[in-house]
Amino acid sequence: LSNYYIIIRRFYSNLYGREGYLTWTLPASPHAIILSKFVGALVASLYCLFLLFLSGFITILVMGAVIGQDLSPVFSIIAEAFSHSIAYWIIVWWIFTTASGIFLFYVSIALGQLFQNRRGLKAILFFFLLCIVLSIIGTAVNPLKDSYAVGSALVYGNIDEFGPNFIPGLIYEVIKIVSMYFTIHYISKYKLNLQ
């Protein structure tokens, strides 16, 4: 949660807050400014995700040492999971959904800037409205929506064949990312009104 708070706060204050006057007078295009904020946020989010998995790994090691049991079967299960292509599809899925989530925060803040007063409140309202609408649309292309197919893939061992089910979801995420990016760019370039 603190990572998201930092991402939101830095984007808002650097582009639409008091620092916005300085940011928009830099000799850089709006594309460069928005992409620099996005890349920084994406790297920070993926780093936090990596640290989460690393801490889980260390916790398993410490648990094994404390209880005095060999936890090598746990590591063999993890290694076996990464031998399937589905693990790589899930990693790519996480990267795209993380990027989409960051742009969702950014586009909500940008849409809130279209109003003269109570911009923060309107940004929060846009966030919840966009979450509802995008979630309804996203259920149609969610790769894990068919629980029978997931269960069958796990039971019968053909989990590698399940990977291509991620393609419609990834296309949807790319469409969301591109549309939100250009919405942010348009608002920042043509409708920017710093107060």
PLM region spans:
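Hydrophobic alpha-helical transmembrane segments of membrane proteins
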Residues: L1-E19, P30-Q195
